Amino acid sequence: MGSLRLSTVAIAVVVCLSILLISPTEVDGRQVCDYDKGECNSYEKSSTCIEPCKQLDSKFIGGRCIPVGGITGMGLCVCCRDVQRGAEKESM
């Protein structure tokens, strides 16, 4: 019973730290991937997050699946936006 509780806590800590480390994630210095779209399977192609993110809002230019579950294949789908494009829209 105690080892089950300890492993549950360990998994929760790993997931939380992974989320903190990837949020926000910069890609090529122009894109920021900081909107959590939900869970994804990190073993599948990363393109599984691209279309759902683009359909969510026009400010998103894509998305990617970031592994957070280690060997379980659990991932976090994050949507990416162009920082320059977002700044231009806000100034209008």
UniProtKB/Swiss-Prot annotation:
Keywords: Antimicrobial, Disulfide bond, Fungicide, Plant defense, Secreted, Signal. It comes from Arabidopsis thaliana (Mouse-ear cress). One of its GO terms (cellular component) is extracellular region. The keyword Secreted applies. It is found in: Secreted. Residues 1-29 form the signal peptide. GO terms for biological process: defense response to fungus; killing of cells of another organism. This is Defensin-like protein 96. Disulfide bonds join 33-80, 40-65, 49-77, 53-79. Transmembrane segments: none annotated. Belongs to the DEFL family.
